[in-house]
């Protein structure tokens, strides 16, 4: 997920994919996610990588991640949290790996001190109330310290509305909440890949084609967005779109469909540009007309 200057929301750029075979004995999704994160960390040494996932991506596979990788996910209601391990006593025997067990999340929320926090989620600025607890989620991350962020939408009331956990101990509560909210761009990217790029429409039978077609389509989507961000963007793009559709008055930022449409027009124009002026053929005129009439194609 990256932030682009011409967009008010983060955008997801797929760079890796793995095949999951349903109803078969295969590697778990979490293990595959870990392998992709390790591959990305190896390709980007020295870069900080923040991974955000839903509650399904939490397990013992997350132990031993590189220091440059942080993991943020939703905390389960029945998660067993512990105090950090006490200092060594110097006595013989194995040192303790964890402290006393903490109360449940509901009990922690009753006694926690919630403070107002300004966050930007889904393109809007709002005020929520957060409380943090530094502890261990030993069943998942082992002895690694984590920060639990309890979120409450309203000032009044008891309990909490959302519980997040992160291994990024330097992140503020607002940053953790915003980071988790930005995960929604993954769902938007998958929808764009299916509806605009055509990922998943191929009818493949060969094993290699099944493994490569969808990742190739996702990479093409990423390359198209990168091209638009570096070379294709023009401030007049949105104004041009609103001129074509004057009833669409709320549009203020280009969409992925706009990016793909402009890339298509540029490719068509480059394809039919001649070295010397010549009369275009009816087929060429028809292709250009279709490209301009259907910018989302």
Could you say what each language-model-derived stretch is?
Residues 10-297:
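Single, function-defining residue in the core of a domain
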Residues 1-9:
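Short conserved beta-strand segments at catalytic cores or DNA/RNA-binding microdomains
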């Amino acid at each position: 997920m990256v932030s682009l200057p011409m967009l008010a929301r983060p955008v997801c750029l797929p760079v890796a994919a793995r095949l999951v075979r349903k109803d078969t004995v295969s590697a778990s999704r979490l293990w595959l996610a870990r392998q992709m994160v390790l591959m990305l960390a190896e390709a980007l040494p020295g870069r900080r990588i923040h991974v955000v996932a839903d509650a399904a991506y939490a397990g013992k596979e997350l132990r031993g991640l590189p220091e440059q990788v942080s993991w943020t996910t939703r905390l389960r209601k029945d998660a067993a949290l512990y105090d950090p391990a006490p200092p060594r006593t110097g006595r013989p025997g194995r040192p303790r790996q964890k402290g006393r067990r903490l109360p449940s999340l509901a009990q922690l929320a009753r006694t926690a001190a919630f403070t107002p926090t300004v966050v930007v989620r889904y393109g809007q600025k709002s005020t929520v109330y957060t409380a943090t607890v530094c502890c261990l989620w030993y069943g998942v991350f082992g002895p690694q310290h984590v920060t639990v962020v309890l979120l409450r939408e309203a000032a009044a009331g008891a309990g909490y509305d959302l519980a997040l956990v992160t291994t990024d101990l330097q992140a503020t509560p607002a940053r953790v909440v915003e980071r988790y909210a930005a995960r929604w761009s993954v769902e938007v990217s998958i929808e764009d890949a299916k509806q605009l790029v055509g990922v998943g429409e191929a009818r493949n039978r060969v094993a290699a084609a099944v493994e490569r077609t969808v990742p190739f389509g996702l990479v093409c989507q990423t390359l198209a967005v990168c091209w638009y961000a570096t070379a294709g963007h023009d401030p007049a793009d949105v104004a041009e779109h609103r001129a074509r559709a004057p009833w669409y008055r709320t549009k203020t930022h280009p969409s992925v469909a706009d990016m793909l449409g402009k890339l298509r027009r540029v490719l068509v124009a480059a394809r039919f540009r001649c070295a010397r002026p010549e009369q275009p053929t009816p087929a060429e005129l028809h292709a250009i007309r279709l490209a301009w009439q259907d910018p989302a194609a």
